[in-house]
Curated annotation (Swiss-Prot):
Record function comment: Essential for merozoite invasion of host cells by controlling rhoptry secretion. Binds to phosphatidic acid (PA) and phosphatidylinositol 4,5-bisphosphate (PIP2) lipids and thus, likely contributes to the assembly of the machinery that docks or primes the rhoptry to the parasite cell membrane prior to the fusion with the host cell membrane.
Keyword Transcription: no
Organism field: Plasmodium falciparum (isolate 3D7)
The entry's keywords: Cytoplasmic vesicle, Membrane
Protein name (Swiss-Prot/TrEMBL): Rhoptry surface protein CERLI1
Cross-referenced Pfam families: PH_CERLI1 (PF23634)
Protein's gene: CERLI1
Domain PH: 252-363
GO CC annotation: cytoplasmic vesicle; rhoptry membrane
Signal peptide: none
Length: 446
């Protein structure tokens, strides 16, 4: 006989609870950390050659998708990236002539027990997204062994049928090397490291030599890692040299408009000029004009930029809020990306604004210290020595480049009078004079 007493009820309840718990654990076992995530156990796994690599950060750049079956030109697609229990998603992108331009970059972490990177493509529907296809990328054989390749194509399959290809790039960056003080410029560091890594044929030769000597692929990559050396070199630079290096990250093509109307956009090449402690983010019709600072369409002073905003409604648009010198009115610069992720542009400009403000603060402190030092010197030095210093400075200023330039200008004005033949005959070659004058033709109003 089965009696309904308290002991039996407790026994049944505990059995039911245990079965529910085991079911939850089985379903969500990926969410639980692997035993190798413990450092000593992880090192033991590496020594026993069970795992081929340590945990590392990877930057995955999704360039575009080539579709074999493109029936609808207005169809939108989204890409899901999955490594273990970590996910990353792109925005929705339109298909045009069986091609989906994405150009988005995702930063992900690969744990040492992760073996595959899964790429899934979904087509946007009215109520629910429909599965289009997927690609399984083996991390060790297709990424680590190939030394983190760029612009590599992977087949997207659906029910053992190839439905398209995905173009991806992989970058290995040791983000742990960046110190706490420099973490506000992380996006600037990442951009410079990636730009160097794109032309790293010599570094690949070093890695191949180490592999031939008997080292594992990941250990060879880690030993010849450029990110730590580049970061050390940049951090040792003076702030002005650091700015000159980071200026290159703000150069590139963008679509520009003065109004919030998404139809009327002009394609310009944006280029950052840095001189006399001022930052001019100029835009030109062509890249060749930017380097020579010719035919400038307009510019924005980065010192007067208040903030950078991402457009809520579209993933390709962003705008900059800024003020002009001696003006209270707020102006907006509406921009659209072409070949770079919108978030990358926003992060770079945001970090650069912080860098500019820090530079200005440092410069102000230096000026204050010099002034304080001069005031102390004047108090200590006698009047006779001060008068000698004044006369010396006047004589040096007379022989300065500025006065030489003005003399040349006067010469040209005199030589323009054709009636005076003596001056005209003794003129010589006026080419260098006009060359010096043409340097200041493109002046800035502020």
């Amino acid at each position: 006989m089965f009696y309904l007493d308290t002991h039996n009820i407790l026994y049944l309840g505990s059995c039911l609870l245990a079965s529910v718990c085991t079911l939850c654990i089985c379903r969500n076992r990926e969410l639980f950390p692997h035993i190798s995530e413990n450092k000593p156990i992880g090192q033991l796994y590496r020594l026993m050659n069970i795992h081929k690599y340590e945990s590392f950060s990877i930057i995955i750049q999704i360039h575009h998708l080539n579709l074999k079956f493109g029936d609808d030109d207005n169809a939108k697609f989204i890409v899901h990236l999955k490594i273990g229990n970590r996910y990353a998603y792109t925005h929705y992108h339109k298909q045009y002539q069986n091609k989906v331009h994405i150009e988005e970059r995702k930063n992900m972490v690969v744990k040492q027990n992760n073996n595959t990177l899964r790429l899934e493509v979904y087509k946007k529907g009215t109520l629910k997204n429909t599965f289009f296809g997927s690609a399984e990328i083996h991390i060790y054989s297709e990424i680590v062994k190939k030394l983190f390749p760029c612009n590599v194509y992977f087949n997207i399959t659906n029910k053992n049928q190839i439905v398209g290809t995905a173009c991806l790039s992989f970058h290995y960056i040791n983000l742990d090397c960046i110190k706490k003080d420099d973490q506000i410029y992380t996006s600037l560091f990442i951009e410079t490291i990636i730009s160097v890594q794109k032309n790293q044929t010599k570094n690949n030769e070093k890695i191949e030599k180490l592999i031939d000597e008997g080292k594992e692929h990941f250990e060879a990559i880690k030993e010849t890692d450029l990110s730590t050396t580049i970061y050390k070199n940049i951090s040792n630079l003076v702030l002005e040299d650091k700015i000159r290096l980071f200026c290159k990250n703000l150069n590139g093509y963008l679509l520009h408009s003065n109004f919030y109307i998404k139809r009327f956009y002009n394609k310009y090449y944006f280029y950052l000029h840095f001189f006399k402690g001022k930052f001019y983010w100029c835009y030109y019709n062509e890249e060749a004009d930017a380097k020579m600072d010719k035919n400038r369409v307009g510019y924005v002073r980065l010192e007067y930029v208040a903030n950078v905003y991402s457009d809520v409604y579209s993933h390709k648009y962003f705008y900059i809020k800024y003020r002009k010198k001696n003006e209270r009115k707020e102006n907006y610069l509406y921009l659209k990306t072409i070949d770079k992720d919108r978030n990358i542009w926003v992060n770079i400009i945001h970090d650069f604004i912080i860098l500019v403000s820090n530079y200005k603060r440092e410069r102000k402190n230096k000026k204050y210290k010099i002034k304080e030092f001069k005031d102390n010197l004047i108090e200590d030095t006698p009047k006779e020595i001060l008068e000698i210093n004044k006369t010396l400075s006047r004589s040096l200023s007379n022989n300065s480049m500025k006065n030489k330039y003005l003399d040349k200008k006067k010469k040209v004005e005199v030589l323009s009078d054709m009636d005076n033949e003596e001056n005209y005959m003794n003129s010589g070659d006026l080419g260098p004079v006009f060359k010096d004058m043409s340097k200041n033709m493109y002046n800035y109003s502020d």
